[in-house]
Amino acid sequence: MASQGTKRSYEQMETGGERQDATEIRASVGRMIGGIGRFYIQMCTELKLSDYEGRLIQNSITIERMVLSAFDERRNKYLEEHPSAGKDPKKTGGPIYRRVDGKWMRELILYDKEEIRRVWRQANNGEDATAGLTHIMIWHSNLNDATYQRTRALVRTGMDPRMCSLMQGSTLPRRSGAAGAAVKGVGTIAMELIRMIKRGINDRNFWRGENGRRTRIAYERMCNILKGKFQTAAQRAMMDQVRESRNPGNAEIEDLIFLARSALILRGSVAHKSCLPACVYGLAVASGHDFEREGYSLVGIDPFKLLQNSQVFSLIRPNENPAHKSQLVWMACHSAAFEDLRVSSFIRGKKVVPRGKLSTRGVQIASNENVEAMDSSTLELRSRYWAIRTRSGGNTNQQKASAGQISVQPTFSVQRNLPFERATVMAAFSGNNEGRTSDMRTEVIRMMESAKPEDLSFQGRGVFELSDEKATNPIVPSFDMSNEGSYFFGDNAEEYDN
């Protein structure tokens, strides 16, 4: 983006730092990762988990959720003020799975939040280390993105379920800060804004008084975040209109839906980071890796190297395919839920199949499922190549896409043309073209119509051998363009339910 100079890098957002040079950034990200690892090791000790149990991704997720809950100030305050029967606001917990006599058993644990905060701070040099907490949130968000569809949520806000490639980060909590905002897709932020506007329409006091003033500031800030993701002047000008509206209502909702649709072709900039489960960082720290000294980057080769030699297990339900479970977690680790499957397959060195063809449900296991009938297997999280993660959407061109997802959001910085089906997308733009933003709308539509399939629309570096740590010899893969590229194609993924 042109305004690069004024932006902090994603890693700086991630670590809450001010301007730093590359080495300092690598060190502070490393410090954050090391803190997560040390915390995980300590929790495994407190819970008396065996080495094998500590590598179980379901146990990792429970421990991660406990620390997020322990630090969720607003919810903790709410729980204390609105006590509900049988819930201790000072405690948090979840299922821990243990191997007993050759079978898996579930044990529900409860912990003092204060105790968990103590362990977390101790692992992070006495600090609250919010960056590490956000990092864990992004990992959970990436896992949700790969596991669930957001069809219902899209339909509820008046958007088209085929716009799912714009919904990255839709389950991230509001408190995830700048690092969280960077990884949110255009559709996610449009949806948050639409929800706000709808509340304002239904509740006369929403924008009024001291609370209303705070709401207004949040609204304008969110508008600016969304504006910053768009790469064309017309889209940004429309965002200015939405932000400056005295009394946001249906006209603004229309504009936001229009803008979200336009992002299927004129793609926004959305950051991608490889965030791994806490147990992976724990394993590395336990084996003597000093993240802060070595430095670490979420967008380079480091996560690939870490996954090359980490053994993580997962519980597998009786009718699930372990290879498919591995694909799901691999996609989550690299934030590749909306990436072109051909690119993902090339990097992974194994065919990555669409969600509808996966015989696996989510990673987490419901409390009413019978764990004794389950086995565990190793997740195959290694890759054949590595590639730099991207923060831009690339400009687009056309190509036949599918009935499920009609566009992709690139994760890896690899040259390719980006599939989308112009006819399908443009059909969404017939109709409403009047109102204050008509000239901008016309301009946006004109740009979309002139997007050409011949252009190499995403200029990327290419992929690299895992031995090529400095990214010196890019390999530009050639893709069979007749092939299906989107993951949620013809989909039957489960809906995300809070």
Curated annotation (Swiss-Prot):
The keyword Ribonucleoprotein applies. InterPro entries: Flu_NP. Residues 1-22 are annotated as: Disordered. One of its GO terms (biological process) is viral penetration into host nucleus. Signal peptide: none annotated. It is found in: Virion; Host nucleus. It comes from the Viruses. Disulfide bonds: none annotated. Its main location: virion. GO terms for cellular component: helical viral capsid; host cell; host cell nucleus; ribonucleoprotein complex; viral nucleocapsid. Coiled coil: none annotated. Keywords: Capsid protein, Helical capsid protein, Host nucleus, Host-virus interaction, Ribonucleoprotein, RNA-binding, Viral nucleoprotein, Viral penetration into host nucleus, Virion, Virus entry into host cell. Residues 8-22 have a biased composition (Basic and acidic residues). The keyword Ribonucleoprotein applies. Encapsidates the negative strand viral RNA, protecting it from nucleases. The encapsidated genomic RNA is termed the ribonucleoprotein (RNP) and serves as template for transcription and replication. The RNP needs to be localized in the host nucleus to start an infectious cycle, but is too large to diffuse through the nuclear pore complex. NP comprises at least 2 nuclear localization signals that are responsible for the active RNP import into the nucleus through cellular importin alpha/beta pathway. HAMAP family: INFV_NCAP. Belongs to the influenza viruses nucleoprotein family. This is Nucleoprotein. The gene is NP.
